[in-house]
């Protein structure tokens, strides 16, 4: 019989980024769907697991889905605002959606250097309609603050990949709220 052990890893402090815009949530969601190629990427991950056999097939598949957009791929969305309807009885609560997105090529590189980071892959983003519906908040954990090696091992390649991912996500968000 094995004896389980538990370790509490003190990660560097996570940085949660929140952007605010006066854009309607429906517009933010439409732009995010476009940036992540939601229509083209919806079946992508099942195709990865079911049909792809080589790294080159994965690379080609990602490039075909990304197709010059944000460099990130849509995976899923969870409409959490619907849960508040049950609790409040409000049939039309402010919109809250959590998006999962990413790029499997980034994921491969990050996991190579820090397998524990897989707990935070794919990245997630929350889109929240303001209570008075006069704008939208977009929030996400900064990848470089939650995916570095928790044992303190500095890896320059991992750090560079995560800082690049930070910039890629920020550029996507700014493209959405400034467009």
Question: How should each PLM-predicted stretch be described?
Answer:
Residues 2-179:
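Feature detects long, helix-prone N-terminal segments enriched in hydrophobes
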